[in-house]
């Protein structure tokens, strides 16, 4: 420290060297003038107990040390800062008026004494040498420092300052880091709380992740359980459906067995006269009729008999006449109500029934005839009843017990098989002169005479004409029935089918005879229209169309105002099915049936009902054309010009596809034209109401079929259904009388719930809209595939054109709206 402080006056030579030299020279002059005074001054306060011999080496060593220190100090910046500090300190000390500190004063005094000591020449030379050496060193240092690289200065400076900063900051930082124990405890507590918070957060995240995993797994498990449950439910539903189908099949089989055995609820309560009571009861007991217990059969008593479908089938085969019961003789309250409703509806007295042929039958005669027929229509194959002949009634009424007259019949069937002898009753008891004699070679040559005479020529006109004139139909039908009734044949379907084929052949032969003997005039057209039936006419308008054709072709008006113009042949199973379909709808008008007694042609079995739709007197108003028809009118003409032989149906398909591919902008003018035409049409016909006519095509399973194809399809389906169920119902055979009249078959009372298993055409229950009204309906037992088709499609081209002639007058009627797909408009 002493060396640095001693050399401080010389450090500022770079800034004010001239000032220093002038100061020194002035001091030397003053000292020279006052030399003698200075020599007498005491030395102790100046030297501070230091001899002169020691002061000079100290000064020289100080100068050398300063030179060495200056040589080490190579930074110009450091030199300037140090010089500035020293100069400021030196000037402060020189200019300050305050007293100096003791150490500073002692240093100054040492310098002064060292300067003033010795001779002036020596001191001047030494000072000049010192100044020169200092100047030279300064110049050398300045030139050397200018040539040095700045990086070296920065390195030295950074090293020096780094050491100083390390000495400074390490202690402070250590003090701050170490701190007090309280601060360290606080920091430790903060760190521990932060660590615990982080640990808890980590645990929360892990727990949430585990919960999410568990939730996803539970959801997957729930979905799997739901899928398993749904699959189990579907399997259970499928099993239940299969069980239901099996149960339904078993129920059908049981019901068919019940039908065969006769265990059915009562459908009809016949009334028997007293003279046939015992015989009918015995016959019914042998044939499976179920009599209620405790019934006594006394003369004058009315007793109920449970009718079963098998007896109805036999009744259909036997050809029963209409059942008319006297109101006073009916003991069952339900029958009383039904007959009263029937009498009130049609305004007829049920004591007598007038047939179309002008014959009137009273209830006594009807009862006698019905009793005889009931006793004879059920024949057990295993137990033939012994013949119980009774004397014929000579009072003019028909005696049902003339078995000897039946034995005289010349039918080939009765000659080969003596089935007629085993019958308990004879329904064809007549004088021998009235029974026509038929040759064995042509048993059916006179079955359908064209003359509309009474089927039975009896001397007494008030007597009942027997519905069965000869023994041919009854004997053959009963033989077939007894063969089909055999329990051994129910499992043998081949035998049953053979019997059915024989019956079909018989019916075809009857139809051929009928076609040969019918006149080719108006009656032929009428019968052909009637033979078309209602099976394919599934909507109301087409049936109305068929109804209206009858009076138009015959030109005959209805005798009774209550009867509608429709004519339907009930002797065909197709027509019976059509009537059943009509009866099944509650919206249809109630129908009732008149039976063919006055005439001999099949076409007289008719259904009368009110006409629906547009009356024949009303003019036909065409529909206004829609947008498609407006567009298609010209397009159709263009296509016909290009392809004259193209069918209308193909043209309509082409036009329909084109119309669908058109954009709305292209269709817009045609829609405007449609609006204009609709407005004009509304102004012209303000009361117009669109009544669509039936279409000639039927859509079945997405396919468009014609009427003939539809009929054939329905026949095949019915045949399949008939073969699917066990053959437990007796097919019915048409019964012909001696004069060739084909009589209708079964007599039924209308029930509201027809049995579903009776799918064949011989099912005779019908669902009537009013269950209180008995509907007597007749059916043939067998439906032929080929024969029925031939009978249904007997219409020639002319008749079909007459039926559909107005289709071509208004071809746009096939297009009900623009949204529907256009259908084929054909001329055939």
Curated annotation (Swiss-Prot):
Coiled coil: 184-262
Annotated keywords: Activator, Autism spectrum disorder, Coiled coil, Cytoplasm, Developmental protein, Differentiation, Disease variant, DNA-binding, Intellectual disability, Isopeptide bond, Nucleus, Phosphoprotein, Repressor, Transcription, Transcription regulation, Ubl conjugation
Main location: nucleus
Residues bearing PTM Phosphoserine: 399, 439, 442
Crosslinked positions (Glycyl lysine isopeptide (Lys-Gly) (interchain with G-Cter in SUMO)): 404, 417
Gene3D superfamilies documented for this protein: High mobility group box domain
Subcellular location: Nucleus; Cytoplasm
Residues recorded with modification Phosphothreonine: 119, 401
Biased composition (Polar residues): 393-402, 439-461, 753-781
Extent of Acidic residues compositional bias: 796-809
Tissue spec: Expressed in a wide variety of tissues, most abundantly in skeletal musclen.
Keyword flag Metal-binding: no
Region of interest: Disordered: 1-51, 380-470, 753-828
MF annotations from Gene Ontology: DNA binding; DNA-binding transcription factor activity; DNA-binding transcription factor activity, RNA polymerase II-specific; DNA-binding transcription repressor activity; protein homodimerization activity; RNA polymerase II cis-regulatory region sequence-specific DNA binding; transcription cis-regulatory region binding
DNA-binding region: 621-689
GO biological process: brain development; cartilage condensation; cartilage development; cell fate commitment; cellular response to transforming growth factor beta stimulus; central nervous system development; chondrocyte differentiation; muscle organ development
Cellular component GO terms held in the UniProt record: chromatin; cytoplasm; nucleoplasm; nucleus
Superkingdom assignment: Eukaryota
Summary of subunit composition and partner proteins: Homodimer. Interacts with DAZAP2. May interact with CENPK.
Disease with which this protein is associated in UniProt: Tolchin-Le Caignec syndrome: An autosomal dominant disorder characterized by mildly to moderately impaired intellectual development and behavioral problems, such as autism, attention deficit and hyperactivity disorder, and aggressive episodes. Highly variable, additional features include osteochondroma, craniosynostosis, dysmorphic facies, arachnodactyly, and large head circumference.
Name under which the protein is recorded: Transcription factor SOX-6
Species the sequence originates in: Homo sapiens (Human)
């Amino acid at each position: 420290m002493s060396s640095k402080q001693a050399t401080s006056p010389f450090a500022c030579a770079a800034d004010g060297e001239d000032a220093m030299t002038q100061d020194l020279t002035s001091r030397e002059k003053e000292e020279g003038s006052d030399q003698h005074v200075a020599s007498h001054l005491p030395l102790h306060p100046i030297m501070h107990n230091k001899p002169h011999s020691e002061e000079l080496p100290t000064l020289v060593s100080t100068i050398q040390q300063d030179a060495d220190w200056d040589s080490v100090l190579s930074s110009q910046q450091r030199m300037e800062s140090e010089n500035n500090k020293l100069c400021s300190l030196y000037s402060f000390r020189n200019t300050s008026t305050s007293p100096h500190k003791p150490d500073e004063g002692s240093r100054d005094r040492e310098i002064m004494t060292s300067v003033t000591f010795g001779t002036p020449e020596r001191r001047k030379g030494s000072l000049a040498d010192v100044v020169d050496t200092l100047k030279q060193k300064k110049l050398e240092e300045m030139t050397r420092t200018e040539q040095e690289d700045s990086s070296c200065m920065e390195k030295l400076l950074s090293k020096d300052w780094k050491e100083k900063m390390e000495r400074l900051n390490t202690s402070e930082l250590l003090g701050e880091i170490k701190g007090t124990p309280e601060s360290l405890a606080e920091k430790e507590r903060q760190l521990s709380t932060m660590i615990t918070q982080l640990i808890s957060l980590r645990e929360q995240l892990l727990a949430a992740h585990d919960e999410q995993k568990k939730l996803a797994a539970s959801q997957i498990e729930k979905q799997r359980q739901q899928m398993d449950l749904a699959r189990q439910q579907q399997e259970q539903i499928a099993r239940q459906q299969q069980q239901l189908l099996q149960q339904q099949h078993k129920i059908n089989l049981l019901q068919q067995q019940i039908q065969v055995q006769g265990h059915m609820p009562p459908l009809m309560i016949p009334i028997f006269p007293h003279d046939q009571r015992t015989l009918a009861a015995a016959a019914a007991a042998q044939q499976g009729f179920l009599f209620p217990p405790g019934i006594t059969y006394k003369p004058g008593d009315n007793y109920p008999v449970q009718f079963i479908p098998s007896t109805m089938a036999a009744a259909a085969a036997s050809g029963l006449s209409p059942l008319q019961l006297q109101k006073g003789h009916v003991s069952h309250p339900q029958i009383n109500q039904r007959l009263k409703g029937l009498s009130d509806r049609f305004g007829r007295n049920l004591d007598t029934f007038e047939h179309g042929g002008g014959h009137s039958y009273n209830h006594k005669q009807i009862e006698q005839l019905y009793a005889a027929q009931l006793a004879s229509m059920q024949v057990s194959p295993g137990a033939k009843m012994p013949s119980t002949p009774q004397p014929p009634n000579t009072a003019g009424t028909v005696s049902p017990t003339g078995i000897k007259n039946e034995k005289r019949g010349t039918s080939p069937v009765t000659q080969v098989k003596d089935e007629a002898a085993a019958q308990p009753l004879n329904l064809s008891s007549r004088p021998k002169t009235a029974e026509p004699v038929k040759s064995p070679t042509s048993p059916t040559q006179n079955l359908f005479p064209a003359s509309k005479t009474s089927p039975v020529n009896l001397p007494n006109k008030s007597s009942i004409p027997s519905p069965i004139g000869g023994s041919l139909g009854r004997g053959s039908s009963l033989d077939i029935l007894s063969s089909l009734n055999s329990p051994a044949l129910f499992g043998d379907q081949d035998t049953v089918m053979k019997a059915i084929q024989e019956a079909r052949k018989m019916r075809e032969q009857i139809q051929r005879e009928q076609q040969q003997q019918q006149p080719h005039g108006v009656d032929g057209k009428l019968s052909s229209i009637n033979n078309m039936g209602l099976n394919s006419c599934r909507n109301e308008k087409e049936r109305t169309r068929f109804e209206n054709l009858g009076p138009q072709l015959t030109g005959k008006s209805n005798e009774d105002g209550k009867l509608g113009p429709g004519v339907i042949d009930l002797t065909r199973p197709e027509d019976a099915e059509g009537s059943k379909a009509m009866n099944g709808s509650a919206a249809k008008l109630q129908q009732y049936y008149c039976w063919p007694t006055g005439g001999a042609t099949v076409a007289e079995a008719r259904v009368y009902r009110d006409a629906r739709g547009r009356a024949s007197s009303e003019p036909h108003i065409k529909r206004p054309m829609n947008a498609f028809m407006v567009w298609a009118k010209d397009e159709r003409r263009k296509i016909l010009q290009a392809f004259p032989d193209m069918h209308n149906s193909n043209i309509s398909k082409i036009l329909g596809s084109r119309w669908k591919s058109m954009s709305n902008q292209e269709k817009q003018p045609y829609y405007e034209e449609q609006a204009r035409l609709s407005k004009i049409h509304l102004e012209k016909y303000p009361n117009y109401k669109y009544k669509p006519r039936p279409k000639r095509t039927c859509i079945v399973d997405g396919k468009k079929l014609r009427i003939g194809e539809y009929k054939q399809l329905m026949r095949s389906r019915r045949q399949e259904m008939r073969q699917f169920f066990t053959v437990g119902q007796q097919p019915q055979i048409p019964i012909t009388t001696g004069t060739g009249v084909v009589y209708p078959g079964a007599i039924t009372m209308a029930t509201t719930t027809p049995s579903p298993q009776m799918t064949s055409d011989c099912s005779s229950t019908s669902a009537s809209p009013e269950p209180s009204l008995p509907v007597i309906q007749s059916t043939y037992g067998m439906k032929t595939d080929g024969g029925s088709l031939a009978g249904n499609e007997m219409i020639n081209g002319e008749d079909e054109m007459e039926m559909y002639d107005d289709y071509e007058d208004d071809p746009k009627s096939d297009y009900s709206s623009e949204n529907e797909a256009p259908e084929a408009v054909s001329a055939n």
